[in-house]
C-alpha cells in the first residue's frame, strides 16, 4: 500500500497537524506501507483561474505552470491520500483549499447521476478515481463539534470525484502539542501511540474504524482545564506585548 499525506498547515513540519500525521505514517510504515509526507506550504500552488482549459483544450492538464502537475502525479500513484489540515474558520486552511481547487483536472466535466439521483462529475481515468481518503485535522477548540463543516466537506468532495473517505482523525485541544509540561507528556505520548495504531489499522484492514476514530476524539485533558489554561495563556501574552 502506498500512502501520501498532504499537510495544509502554513507551519509545515512545526505544525500541530504534523504532530498527528507523523505518528500516523509511522504506524502505517510498521504495517508495511510505503509513505510520503508533503508539506503544501513548501510548494508553488497558485489559485485556480476557473478557465476550464483542463476540461476543454488540454483535458486532464492544467495550464498553470507550478507544482500542481507533479503533486497530481503523486496522488495518482498512491492508494490512499491523507488530507491533513488545521481547522481555519470552521474549514480547511487557505493553502489546503487552494490545493483542492486545483484538483479539477482529475474530473471529467460531464455530469451523471449517482445511486441517489444526484449529479456528480465523471472521474477521469488514471487519476483519482476510486482513491481512498483519510482526513486528519486539529483545532484549538475544546469540542469536536467544530469539525462538522470540515467533515461534511471532505465527504461531499470524495463523493463528487468517485472516491471514499475510509478514515477520519479529528483532534481538539490541538494547542497542547507544543507545550513542554511534565504532566502532559505521558498524555500526548499515549495519544501518539493510538494514532500509530490507527495507521497500522488502515494498512491491515483498509480503513480506520468508527470505534478507533471515536477513541481518538476523546479529550486529552478536561475541557474546563483546557479552556482556563488557554485563556490564561492569551492574557499573559497580550499583557507582555503591552496591549
Q: What spans do the regions from the language model cover?
A:
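N-terminal beta1-alpha1-beta2 submodule of the flavodoxin-like/Rossmannoid cofactor-binding fold
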Residues: 1-111, 159, 166, 185-243
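A generic secondary-structure micro-motif detector
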Residues: 14, 61, 143-144, 171
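A short acidic, helix-capping loop that chelates divalent metal ions and anchors anionic groups
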Residues: 176-180
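Short, histidine-centered active-site or binding-site loop motifs used for metal coordination
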Residues: 7-10, 137-140, 173
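Short, solvent-exposed loop/turn segments at secondary-structure boundaries
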Residues: 15-16, 145-148, 181-182
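Short, glycine-/small-residue-rich phosphate/pyrophosphate-handling segment
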Residues: 94-95, 107-161
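Short, catalytically relevant binding-site loops at active-site mouths
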Residues: 88-90, 141-143, 173-175
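Beta-strand-loop-alpha "switch" segments that mediate conformational coupling across diverse proteins
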Residues: 166-174
